Design a protein with these regions (language model features):
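An N-terminal assembly and electron-transfer interface module characteristic of large anaerobic redox
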Residues: 1-427
């Protein structure tokens, strides 16, 4: 049973410094670490939404446990980008996996501010990915992000847990050659310059964005008063930005469904969505907004933030008064951004005048190896506190389904689907 600790009350906890953006899930350090480890069969990812009501938290945690058991998991990694009330979901998931004989390694922001509000006997190994010396949540996007180093620690600790459970990876049987189940080919085209022009085009490393690309979109969204699109050159970060709503990649499907086939991706450019309400100037946020001078409000070169060498395609949304506090308003902002990116995708899908780097990813069955699952506990409470699944395009929003609308019932996705952008953060 989960036992509550004396914390003086349970609060929500998801701030700018720990949030996993769409870009973070697209470049997920845990997915990469587990998929690349030769000792594991990475059987899949369970995406579990945080619920509002305690009974629902327990219900979805039990379903995660059932899925883990169905996948014949020997161990699990459980990651969450929130604290406070969200930790009820976190410890319940670890408990339900443990009841079914699946030991877990957890990853969460803890530090001084995010200490667990509840616990149980199965919560015995949690990696604290706090990066702040003060140990407190901040309004700097990416400051307390889960990194490659955290993922490396998780892999090592999972092996230690398996050893204690009598299933050391060294003693796993070799039952034959690995079998590639699904193949994803990613072609990445490097962008060297981004500028405005008469039409949207990509030519020999230059991305041109049509002037006024956002104008017609404003008329489609009643909850949005205005949209401003600008281009931020690498290093030119000494200017004010409104609160961050997301960072996302520019990618498109050329062939196949998300997680297989061929995807085209642009490197050297990242999309940044920000927003503010008209009149009141309210900055959309949960426990802290991230508005301010850009160079002070983001840690670059993290999985969920742009590279310091990237151009940034900045989509700034002016909400009608009150709409930055509604689920519909936040979704409208993400819709507008995706429509803008969609115009770029229409060019990217047929791109043939540039060199590219080629990466091939496979979901792999490894007979006899220890089976490990990754559980991503994501927001599912609505407003700017939700997650959307399976958009039409990699990292997109159009066509997706919100976790809250799905009652936060867990999704099971493949590692390749995660790599191909099936998770979109509405944060």
């Amino acid at each position: 049973m989960v036992s509550l600790l004396n914390t003086g009350g349970v609060s929500m906890g998801l701030g700018p410094s720990i949030k996993m953006t769409t870009l973070h899930h697209y470049q997920c350090p845990l997915t990469n670490a587990l998929a690349n480890d030769p000792d594991f069969e990475f059987t899949g990812i369970i995406v579990d939404g945080v619920s509002e009501v305690c009974d629902d938290k327990i219900y979805t945690a039990k379903r995660v446990g059932d899925i883990g058991q169905m996948l014949r998991a020997d161990a699990a990694v459980v990651a969450i980008d929130a604290w406070g009330n969200h930790h009820v979901d976190f410890v319940n998931v670890i408990e339900q996996l443990g009841i079914r004989g699946i030991p877990s390694v957890g990853l969460s922001y803890i530090a001084q501010q995010g200490r667990l509000v509840c616990t149980n006997n199965f919560v015995d190994c949690v990696i604290d990915f706090n990066k702040s010396a003060a140990g407190y949540e901040s309004c700097v996007v990416g400051e307390n992000n889960l990194t490659d180093y955290d993922a490396m620690k998780a892999v090592a600790l999972v092996k230690n847990k398996l050893r204690k459970a009598g299933k050391p990876v060294e003693e796993a049987l070799d039952l034959g050659e690995s079998v590639k189940l699904r193949r994803l080919l990613r072609k990445t085209f490097a962008i060297k310059e981004v500028k405005f022009g008469d039409t949207t085009s990509i030519d020999h490393g230059v991305l041109t964005i049509r002037k006024g690309i956002e104008k017609n979109l404003i008329l489609q969204e009643d909850r949005i008063k205005d949209v401003t699109v600008s281009i931020v050159e690498p290093g030119n970060y000494d200017f004010f930005v409104n609160s961050n709503l997301d960072y996302s990649p520019i990618a498109c499907k050329v062939r196949g469904e998300l997680g297989e086939g061929v995807t085209h991706l642009l490197s050297g450019v990242t999309v940044m969505t920000t927003g503010v309400e008209d009149k009141s100037g309210f900055q959309p946020s949960n426990i802290g907004s991230s508005e301010g001078i850009l160079k002070n409000q983001v840690v670059f070169d993290r999985a969920g933030t742009p590279k310091s060498t990237d151009y940034i395609l900045h989509v700034d949304v002016l909400f009608e008064e009150g709409e930055g506090r509604t689920a519909e308003g936040i979704m409208a902002a993400h819709r507008v951004t995706d429509w803008i990116v969609q115009e770029i995708r229409k060019v990217l899908v047929n791109l043939d005048n540039m060199a590219y780097t080629r990466e091939e990813f496979s979901d792999v069955a490894k007979p006899g190896k220890r089976k490990v699952v990754l559980v991503k506990i994501v927001s599912g409470l609505g407003n700017m506190y939700d997650t959307a699944m399976f958009p039409y395009e990699p990292g997109g929003f159009l066509g997706s389904h919100n976790m809250m609308d799905s009652k936060n019932i867990p999704y099971v996705i493949t590692p390749n689907q995660c790599r191909d952008g099936v998770i979109h953060s509405l944060l």
